[in-house]
Amino acid sequence: MGKKLLSLLIILVLFLNSWNWPNHQSLVEKVYYNLDFKTQQELNVTLLKEGAIIPDKVFHDNVRHSYPRSYPQAKIWLDKASDSYNKKDYENASLYFGIASHYITDTFAAPHNVQKEPPKLHLKFESIKYKPKAKCSQIKIQDLNLSLYKATEGKKEDWLEWVNTRNDEIPKKEMDQSLELLYPLAIQTFNSSCNSLKTEITKIPFKIYNKESLIFLIIIIFILFISMIFRKNKIKLKL
């Protein structure tokens, strides 16, 4: 019983210390599909997404998701990603960038910029279901530390406003802000550029039939039915 309770507490702590896992993966996947086609061929989107949840899932890191502690982790894993990419080790480059993205994007989350926030509200804020819409940008990031520091600006006010209004536009805005930083960091890390062509896979409703095929199927069934009747009658006549 004690072990089960401990496991439950660990899972709860992890969820309270970052955007939920689908959001982390959605952000890094969005980056991938907005890089140029050459870079997409080199990188592994599955490993990017896996890396994006490793700080929670594998490291069980529940203390370095906010600035300034998020900066060293982001820098370490970005450097590892860049080094691996330059060595043409594209799988580790993908994984490491995914890890870096986790620390970067969490820095933008309002609950990570306040203290003693109610756990229930923290979880609700970061469980927002949203597909980020920020567009790819190739601005040069000169100072990651400064960029992450700026990411914290206005976040306490965001939190207070959200607590009072539960306005979903606030966490959505912060996810887009984090994506706006991820784009240029990915471009610099992988010596890439923004993709002018859209290659992202979208879910398209699929019909297993159309009008013509349905009519054809009905005709076939009708012919088979008539054929069966004819054969039965033929057998009776022989008898």
What annotation goes with each model-predicted range?
Residues L12-L95, N113-K207, I218-F222:
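N-terminal, motif-rich segments that launch catalysis or mediate targeting to/interaction with membranes
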Residues A93-S101, T105:
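Short alpha-helix carrying the canonical HExxH Zn2+-binding catalytic motif
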